[in-house]
Curated annotation (Swiss-Prot):
<comment type="subunit">
    <text>Interacts with DVL1. Interacts with RBPJ.</text>
</comment>
<dbReference type="GO" id="GO:0043565">
    <property type="term" value="F:sequence-specific DNA binding"/>
</dbReference>
<feature type="binding site">
    <location>
        <position position="269"/>
    </location>
    <ligand>
        <name>Zn(2+) 1</name>
    </ligand>
</feature>
<keyword id="KW-0804">Transcription</keyword>
<protein>
    <recommendedName>
        <fullName>CXXC-type zinc finger protein 5</fullName>
    </recommendedName>
</protein>
<dbReference type="GO" id="GO:0008270">
    <property type="term" value="F:zinc ion binding"/>
</dbReference>
<keyword id="KW-0539">Nucleus</keyword>
<keyword id="KW-0238">DNA-binding</keyword>
<keyword id="KW-0597">Phosphoprotein</keyword>
<keyword id="KW-0863">Zinc-finger</keyword>
<dbReference type="InterPro" id="IPR040388">
    <property type="entry name" value="CXXC4/CXXC5"/>
</dbReference>
<keyword id="KW-0862">Zinc</keyword>
<dbReference type="Pfam" id="PF02008">
    <property type="entry name" value="zf-CXXC"/>
</dbReference>
<keyword id="KW-0963">Cytoplasm</keyword>
<feature type="modified residue" description="Phosphothreonine">
    <location>
        <position position="53"/>
    </location>
</feature>
<dbReference type="GO" id="GO:0043123">
    <property type="term" value="P:positive regulation of canonical NF-kappaB signal transduction"/>
</dbReference>
<feature type="compositionally biased region" description="Low complexity">
    <location>
        <begin position="11"/>
        <end position="20"/>
    </location>
</feature>
Amino acid sequence: MSSLGGGSQDAGGSSSSSTNGSGGSGSSGPKAGAADKSAVVAAAAPASVADDTPPPERRNKSGIISEPLNKSLRRSRPLSHYSSFGSSGGSGGGSMMGGESADKATAAAAAASLLANGHDLAAAMAVDKSNPTSKHKSGAVASLLSKAERATELAAEGQLTLQQFAQSTEMLKRVVQEHLPLMSEAGAGLPDMEAVAGAEALNGQSDFPYLGAFPINPGLFIMTPAGVFLAESALHMAGLAEYPMQGELASAISSGKKKRKRCGMCAPCRRRINCEQCSSCRNRKTGHQICKFRKCEELKKKPSAALEKVMLPTGAAFRWFQ
């Protein structure tokens, strides 16, 4: 009995030991799987940490940091980084990370090509930026040249205008010098008037500064084939009403004309309204006659009688020379 009990106990112990051994082996199996998973996680953790770390700064020969133009390419890494990472990986995760490293290698190659294209684009943009500057400079030079040409044209036009004005002034001076001696033949005593006028012109200022060399107003002279005569307005400017012989003077000056003018000083000349009663007013449309009450008294006289009585004042009548 004892032997049988001991045998059973031995069998139970062996069974228990076998079960324990199997349990131990079973328990050791999950522990080994957990260790493998932890190794894979530990191997993958540096990759995630490496992904989170910023890429190293790349500098060119001048020391300038060369960054890609696109913001999405700032996390790109050189191909050596991915190749070294793939070679340093564990044997267990090598097959798992092989495809991922290949994808990253292709992405790095694409990033490098994009970076090269970006540098080419930057160079092209720099050339384009330099070209508009040169175009702008050439346009500014062309505009300055056009402005200079326009200024020279305006100066030439101004000189031509001044030359024409000088020529016209010289011609007018010559005409006045040619016709002034004829005035002395119009009546007695006119040479004295010329002498007085010349003296006053030398000593006094001209009333017409725009004429320059002319001390008299050319509009006061009427140039006709018969000669040069003073206009009627000249006698009004001279103020001949102060002298008693103004009628005779007006008749003497205007005697060289074929048709005499009104003196403008007598009462009929100063009258401005027609009577509308006389025959001249009634027949004005057919006869073209002036009103009898407005007919100048000096025109009623004969020209010869007026010439005999001419007495000229001592230059005071020609006040426009002063």
